Curated annotation (Swiss-Prot):
Catalyzes the phosphorylation of the 3'-hydroxyl group of dephosphocoenzyme A to form coenzyme A. Pathway: Cofactor biosynthesis; coenzyme A biosynthesis; CoA from (R)-pantothenate: step 5/5. InterPro entries: Depp_CoAkinase, P-loop_NTPase. The gene is coaE. ATP binds at residues 11-16. It comes from Symbiobacterium thermophilum (strain DSM 24528 / JCM 14929 / IAM 14863 / T). Gene3D superfamilies: P-loop containing nucleotide triphosphate hydrolases. GO terms for biological process: coenzyme A biosynthetic process. HAMAP family: Dephospho_CoA_kinase. Belongs to the CoaE family. Its main location: cytoplasm. This is Dephospho-CoA kinase. PANTHER family: BIFUNCTIONAL COENZYME A SYNTHASE-RELATED (PTHR10695:SF46), DEPHOSPHO-COA KINASE-RELATED (PTHR10695). One of its GO terms (molecular function) is ATP binding. Keywords: ATP-binding, Coenzyme A biosynthesis, Cytoplasm, Kinase, Nucleotide-binding, Transferase.
Length: 239
């Protein structure tokens, strides 16, 4: 089974690309959805967060106040690392549980949708990494429009993560999401076909041509039938 790591940064459009990948039949494991489930009231992760950050991160209805928690961790790298130490091990365990479930089902490929893929070391556990990229100004404008943050708050949240340009330099494939949905979809379809052994797709990192290709039918390829063990596994997880 082939494992593709999908990442980006806040307001880059990774969720849009993740949804597009489901269309040609990819099994997508959404790390954000796992985090939300693990942080429900009464779970061990929820209780650990409240112990670490105090009752101020709990809403009157007893649920986690993610905005309040976000204000704390995006302003203080030490507090962010404390949160990651609580959340990441539980998320990692659940992701691998789902990967093994898809493997037992005979799925030929799975996409790990992980926002902090590089930061948490998932790039060493997958066959290839795709990064959803936009320029810094587009990212900031989209974040402000989406969340209502001030320009200063938006800049702080963006700065708290590895830059998209750095992620793009490390990536195997880049999805340029500055343009229309149709242009993004064409790149996703082409990259999916290339990952499955066909033609097309965005060039690997380091290439000078990071522009969308024409729409490509996902077509036949290794992703349409049971595949070999992931390259990352055959290399012992070392990229």
């Amino acid at each position: 089974m082939r494992i593709i790591g999908l990442t980006g940064s806040i307001a880059s459009g990774k969720s849009t690309v993740s949804a597009m990948l489901r269309e040609p039949g990819a099994a997508v494991i959404d790390a954000d959805a796992i985090v939300h489930h693990l942080q429900l009231p009464g779970t061990p992760v929820f209780e650990s967060i409240v112990r670490e950050f105090g009752p101020g991160v709990v809403r009157p209805d007893g649920s986690l106040d993610r905005q309040a928690l976000g204000r704390i961790v995006f302003a203080d790298p030490g507090r962010r690392r404390a949160l990651e130490a609580i959340v990441h091990p539980a998320v990692r365990a659940e992701i691998w549980r789902q990967v093994e479930q898809y493997r037992r089902e005979g799925r030929p490929a799975v996409v790990l949708d992980v926002p902090l893929l590089y930061e948490s070391g998932w790039d060493r556990q997958v066959d290839e990494v795709w990064v959803v990229w936009v320029d810094a100004e587009t990212q900031k404008a989209r974040l402000i429009a989406r969340s209502g943050l001030s320009p200063e708050e938006a800049e702080a949240r963006i700065a708290a993560q590895m830059s998209l340009d750095e992620k793009a330099r490390r990536a195997d494939r880049i999805i340029d999401n500055r343009g229309s949905l149709d242009r993004t979809r064409a790149q996703v379809e082409a990259a999916w076909r290339a990952a499955c052994g066909g033609e097309g797709g965005e060039p690997a990192a380091g290439s000078s041509a990071h522009h969308g290709a024409g729409s490509v039918d996902p077509g036949a390829g290794p992703c349409d039938g049971p595949g070999a063990a992931p390259e990352a596994e055959r290399r012992g997880g070392d990229r």
